[in-house]
Amino acid sequence: MKLILNLITAGSLLVALAPAQPRYTVADLGAFPGGNSSAGYGINNAGWVTGCSNLTPGGPLQSFIWYGIGPLIEIPTLGGPGGCADGPNAFGEAAIISATSKPPYMNEAFCGLTGASGDQNQCLAAVWKNGRLTALPTLPGGHNSQTYWLNNLGQVVGFSENGISDPTCATGTPYQVLRFEGVIWGPDGEVRELRPLEGDTTGFAWGINDHGQAVGSSGLCSNTSVSGPVGPTAPHAVLWDRDGSPTDLGHLEGVPAGVYNVATSINDRGDVVGFAQASDGTQHGFLWTKETGMQDIGGFPGAGNGTGAPCCNTINNTGEIVGFSIDANFNFRALVWQDKMPIDLNTLIPADSPLYLTGSESLNDSGQITGTAIVKSSCPVTTPPAWQTNQSLCTETHAFVATPCFP
């Protein structure tokens, strides 16, 4: 799961529209009553959306599912003050991360659901199925786990602590004590370890396809983070085959090993997308195929602090890609890729939209996109608009669904 509200934008190169390129209508999904912030993280082929919203401004996030009409439906937690949902699959099942009522182990801040580092409850991976939330087991000795995605077979991917204390964890992952590894749960709830690459000690799985192939990253606890502006990061992008054997997906051409490379999504053809750090320190989206290896599919030059480039979140079974970018001032922008080039999704929606789209998190095989948007009316009146150049001044964000339409 792309935890927590890691929504992103960047100013720079925008691509001219091709005549056959779709435009989009946008539906505002709102937030829970009393809340001011929501995000859509997954959308299935029926147009159902999962994500999370707060119940009060600044309050903890709570999982939701939206069935294409009506309000957001709240999904309960495992007893703690927060949760977030990914998926859903074709059957409406969702991958959940949920806080429990237990205090954090050794003051760890593994989840990012309820507040500042060191002020966390235990969190566990769970699955929402047939109207019930069921906790999934951790690896032996682990206290915390997270989910990121699930497939139509009911397999869920994420990562779990494994009970091994590592004093180097606090260097790369503040408030983390135990190592963690990528895992697959299910389809019957059992947990299976996804071992990191040889020489690595930690890892996480971010995506899975309907063939049971999973993707994510691995590294050392000293250079792997469980959370950050773009989610967890580690040096090596990894593809795990159905039998759990890992493959190193490499790095962008000309970039030395050791910077982060994160695989986020894999479609049923085995194509993988993610983000990687380039030699100039900027972040670039990538597409990996078995035939071509890792290809750079666009960066936004000009934000030389290492944050000013796109992140690919999801690739669907037709090869469409969505994501987001962030500029040097931490302003976010939703992206969709056309011909391997990132396009600002805001240029493809009605100009008078009340929303400014800040993050494209997922899309289905019909090209519908969900993510997060700023409510323009929650921003002060400035020139240029605050929703583009000073987003921290805006006070309300909503989940959205963008549906393609052709001229």
Outline where the language-model segments fall.
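Residue-level hotspots at or immediately adjacent to binding/recognition sites across diverse folds
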Residues: L3-L5, G11, L17-P407
